[in-house]
Amino acid sequence: MVRMVPVLLSLLLLLGPAVPQENQDGRYSLTYIYTGLSKHVEDVPAFQALGSLNDLQFFRYNSKDRKSQPMGLWRQVEGMEDWKQDSQLQKAREDIFMETLKDIVEYYNDSNGSHVLQGRFGCEIENNRSSGAFWKYYYDGKDYIEFNKEIPAWVPFDPAAQITKQKWEAEPVYVQRAKAYLEEECPATLRKYLKYSKNILDRQDPPSVVVTSHQAPGEKKKLKCLAYDFYPGKIDVHWTRAGEVQEPELRGDVLHNGNGTYQSWVVVAVPPQDTAPYSCHVQHSSLAQPLVVPWEAS
């Protein structure tokens, strides 16, 4: 295991992270999330890797297919990454990651239990300058170990992480490589990916809006406003009654549609004898002014 650590860090130096969409203040991020399972779960790979640029997933890899594959709108992007070569890198990172999970399970002598190791690492740039980086692992949802590039050192949060720390700091060069990855290699990869991705991350897709109503016997009428196919994901959807904002009865989260856009909805309840005008208001960065869709009572 000790001899494998520099290999892992070297791979991290070569591999690029994922970047979130650019917003108006010029922020982008690249994030990788790794997940490993200690026990077999039917139809679920033991190891999975996802990469995101800002809030959009752009690649995936798992221990079943062992192929790095672009996702979503990046399926049409050519030249950003050598996915065949990246598959080899991800396989090596998978080996290290799962070996670490095995070490933890053995430390706690709990090979019969079901456990999860997750890792999250990446970097951010703002106005083309590095503005942050992160590299942390979680075991069964709890903090396990984190790299602090200011010290620099791995900071353990779990008794088993002391062993991981010893292995990952067995040679001073291991720590220096981790620091260099966060401060130099990751931002450089992010900038490289942005050359192919800014048109995706900076786009403004206006929302489509649909207003519907439903009334169950003996209940108030429910008005639903659905906004969909918009990007970026920040949006405000609310109902007004005679021009006054109404408290929603239900509000849906902003969710991915699966095509690189989002959807959200809000519901208000209307008393049976209420004849006041209701309208759905939608505010989004793609709109010059709020979109107002009145509910037409039938």
UniProtKB/Swiss-Prot annotation:
SMART domains: IGc1. SUPFAM superfamilies: Immunoglobulin, MHC antigen-recognition domain. It is found in: Secreted. Residues 1-20 form the signal peptide. One of its GO terms (molecular function) is RNA nuclease activity. PROSITE patterns: IG_LIKE, IG_MHC. InterPro entries: Ig-like_dom (IPR007110), Ig-like_dom_sf (IPR036179), Ig-like_fold (IPR013783), Ig/MHC_CS (IPR003006), Ig_C1-set (IPR003597), MHC_class-I_related (IPR050208), MHC_I-like_Ag-recog (IPR011161), MHC_I-like_Ag-recog_sf (IPR037055). Blood plasma, seminal plasma, urine, saliva, sweat, epithelial cells of various human glands, liver. Pfam families: C1-set, MHC_I. Glycans are attached at residues 109, 112, 128, 259. Residues 207-292 form the Ig-like C1-type domain. Disulfide bonds join 123-186, 225-280. One of its GO terms (biological process) is detection of chemical stimulus involved in sensory perception of bitter taste. GO terms for cellular component: collagen-containing extracellular matrix; external side of plasma membrane; extracellular exosome; extracellular region; extracellular space; nucleus. N-glycosylated. N-glycan at Asn-128: Hex5HexNAc4. Stimulates lipid degradation in adipocytes and causes the extensive fat losses associated with some advanced cancers. May bind polyunsaturated fatty acids. PANTHER family: MHC CLASS I-RELATED, ZINC-ALPHA-2-GLYCOPROTEIN. Interacts with PIP. Belongs to the MHC class I family. This is Zinc-alpha-2-glycoprotein. It comes from Homo sapiens (Human). The gene is AZGP1.
